[in-house]
Amino acid sequence: GGKDSGVMLNIVLDYMRRHGIKRKIGVLYMDVEASYKRTARFIERMYLDNLDLIEPYWVCLPMTTTNAVSMYEPFWIFWDPAKKDKWVRPMPEYDFIINKDNHPFDFYRENMTFEEFALLFGGWYGRQYGDKKTACLVGIRADESLNRYHAVSRKDKLSYKDKSYSTRISDNIYNFYPISDWRTEDIWTYNGKYHKSYNSIYDLFYMAGVPLSRMRICEPYGDEQKAGLSLFKVLEPETWIKVVDRVSGANFGNIYCGTKATGARKISLPQGHTWKSYCKFLLRTLPEETRNIYTTKFIKFIRYWNRIGSPVSEEDIIELDPDMVINTHEYSRRGKGDKHVVRFKTIPDVLPGLDNKTDFLSWKRMCMAILKNDITCRTLSFSMTKKQILRQQELIRKYEEML
């Protein structure tokens, strides 16, 4: 429902009509329930106006995602049947809506993650057509975020016929990013010049004074998205009431997002603490289940960097205390291979000037993960494992029983 995916779909449909292509394409929309009404109306319009060219997959399945605004309910499930009375929006009722009762997906597991579903959908779609080569067109742009830039431009990926805007996902499945080099201004120039449909929530963003670069359509409780919580209150007050009631901590996130309370601003170390002691103090304040998740992640984080060492440039090595580190004088395989592998004798409390880099281990980085309520530890370069997903689902069931 966002500006980028909308533009990409319009371009594809125009190409198909101009060249007389009649074979339908699958169009996946993953409905996360807690979204703007205007987004749903835009999807409805795009689907209904183009049924001659598309196979609509409007997915309203229960899936797990993070709730970065609460330590006590760190995950939530959109379209959770047990919470139907609290759904932010009623489930749409078109024939092409896919829900728990009618879904055709052999890979779907109850309460799997959004990311896992999106990754597996392409393979499933390809199997419906005899395992032929399948192109998954993804409407992302490299200048939107570092993660998106990395997805498009990383050097270690396999591509389709050396096309830089493609990535091989499996033997016959490839992702393509046809507008990856577009800028935000290009998106709106295209919409205006060719009079294309777009999500009208962007008009409200503009009237609310949101800069073009900050206009994002996403569910409101995630690690990065919580900064947009307050916009629900401004743009769709009737939706905001349900957003607040849907998960624990939503109004706290709205009030305190962007403050020290959520780790968004510069954090000063409390008097009498080191970052190590502060990290251990913060862990003691957490609910036991949440504390165990962080502790497990931190142990893996520490062991990983102790084992492989950190890639450090010669100029950065000069900044390090020689009594703290062992310089192996070997070149790291990470990055360009032009940095030396350095191992720390003990975990440094803080590394001034280096803590914002992902290749370094410090107690401050672990503290910041807790303060940002980053329970999946993405700021420490972790991704969610299948084992963790299953554990999350156990926690969700436990918290539901407690509520």
Report the location of each language-model feature:
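Conserved G/P- and acidic residue-centered "switch" motifs that form tight phosphate/ATP-binding loops
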Residues: 2
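Nucleotide-activated chemistry modules centered on ATP-dependent adenylation/adenylyltransferase
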Residues: 5-403
